[in-house]
């Protein structure tokens, strides 16, 4: 495995561990999720370019579209929660209440 791919996989694992460790704050969880999406984008782009998959050149772009949608929804949720409760602790949220 080349060193670039190894570094990207380590970045994904680091973001995943950050997601598991810092799951008490919504902002930290969203940042780790964005790091995971970025490393998945780079790894899929490198894989497609190295293996010459001409039929799947749109896959990284589609991944970026979903990452942008996820970031927009996460930011809207973060703003709503911080305006309502004044903090971004996930433990204080009860999602069953309307």
Curated annotation (Swiss-Prot):
Keywords: Electron transport, Membrane, Mitochondrion, Mitochondrion inner membrane, NAD, Respiratory chain, Translocase, Transmembrane, Transmembrane helix, Transport, Ubiquinone. GO terms for biological process: ATP synthesis coupled electron transport. One of its GO terms (cellular component) is respiratory chain complex I. Its main location: mitochondrion. One of its GO terms (molecular function) is NADH dehydrogenase (ubiquinone) activity. Its EC number is 7.1.1.2. It is a multi-pass membrane protein. Pfam families: Oxidored_q2. It catalyses: a ubiquinone + NADH + 5 H(+)(in) = a ubiquinol + NAD(+) + 4 H(+)(out). It is found in: Mitochondrion inner membrane. The keyword Transmembrane helix applies. Belongs to the complex I subunit 4L family. Core subunit of respiratory chain NADH dehydrogenase (Complex I) which is composed of 45 different subunits. This is NADH-ubiquinone oxidoreductase chain 4L. It comes from Eulemur rubriventer (Red-bellied lemur).
């Amino acid at each position: 495995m080349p060193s670039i791919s190894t570094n990207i996989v380590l970045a994904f694992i680091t973001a995943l561990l950050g997601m598991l460790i810092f799951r008490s704050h919504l902002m930290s969880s969203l940042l780790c999720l964005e790091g995971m999406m970025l490393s998945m984008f780079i790894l899929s782009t490198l894989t497609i370019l190295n293996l010459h998959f001409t039929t799947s050149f749109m896959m990284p772009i589609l991944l970026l579209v979903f990452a942008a949608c996820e970031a927009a929804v996460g930011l809207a949720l973060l703003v709503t929660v911080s305006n309502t409760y004044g903090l971004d602790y996930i433990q204080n949220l009860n999602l069953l209440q309307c």
